[in-house]
Amino acid sequence: MNNEHRFEIEGLTYVMTPANAMAAWQSLKRAGVLLRGMDADALANAQGAASVALGTLLSHLGDPAVTEIEALVFEQTAIKTPEGTTYRLSPDRLNEHFNTRRTHLLRVLMEGVKYQYSDFFVGGMAAFQDLIPMPSAEQE
């Protein structure tokens, strides 16, 4: 995992740093139940798995497991303004930040999910499929 992930939206630089691996893993496992019944072929490679996972999370916004992932992503995100001010997206800053930047919210969440969780899928798909059993062709 990279030490940080940076991207820019409308002049603001979002800087994401890695979450604690075990905290991220625990939240991913809790959200894993949402992936049951997903297309096993799509989960066969890291890129497909990350895309399926991201789409699934977005389709379950409001679920407690997804809310936990949102919190992890936002807590690990800082904003650098063009003036040089830096602040973290702590729970008490979320409303203030996104009330005037609603168009940023989903992009920040999607970038954060990819950054915080995609490395769990790389090289670990067999273990992930054991965690979330997918129906085999014989069972369908």
Swiss-Prot record:
InterPro entries for the chain: Phage_TAC_9 (IPR020351)
Pfam families per record: Phage_TAC_9
Protein name: Uncharacterized protein XF_1585/XF_1690
Record organism: Xylella fastidiosa (strain 9a5c)
